[in-house]
Amino acid sequence: MTEYGRRGVVGMGLAGGAALALGGCAPAQDGRSWPGATPTSDGRFAGFTEYVPVTLEIRTDLGRLDRRMPGVTISSAHWVMQYQQEQREVLPPQDRPIWIHGVMTLDPASTRALAEASSGKADPLPGIYPGLRQYVPEGKVFTTVPKEKADAILDIEHMMQDDPSRFESSSFDTEQVAVCADANLLIFIARERHT
């Protein structure tokens, strides 16, 4: 290879490296959330930290939540779920946990049990998926329920499988729970793992 050819190859390599480095400064594509980014200015909530490559559909069905939390009576719910992933994920979905965020209305007895187990004001509120924040009324006071107490009241130990005929089992663990006794509302962040 001639001297000129080597310089050309090195020059192209440097130019390509610079382009890649500067490409990281480009704005994110629409419909994507990056770790730490909170696309809403609602200061009541902690930052949303999950990577979401596409906008999630907000679900309102209760079946999956009722099966995961048999210790409470859910009247209505708005929730989302997605396999946990990084921007460049290498693990197949079935090998990753599922994160679930939700805002639920509970019956008064369920709310009372959670409120009695709470440990103080939730400030900030759990960093739920930004599309769910519209279902949390402003001006309401939420209290934090410690994980162990929330898990016991929600009775996650007795959760039911979606498909009992499958050999694999799931575990459901709450990570953050906040309750508003006045509005019978529960905000939660949970993870589900398949074994």
PLM segments and residue spans:
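Short, surface-exposed loop and linker segments with low hydrophobicity and enrichment for Pro/Ser/Thr
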Residues: 1, 7, 90-98, 171-185
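Bacterial lipoprotein signal-peptidase II cleavage site
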Residues: 25-35
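Intrinsically disordered, low-complexity boundary segments flanking structured domains
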Residues: 61-69, 88-91, 174
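Mature extracytoplasmic domains of secretory-pathway proteins
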Residues: 71-152
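Extracellularly exposed regions in secreted/surface proteins, prominently low-complexity, repeat-rich
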Residues: 159-195
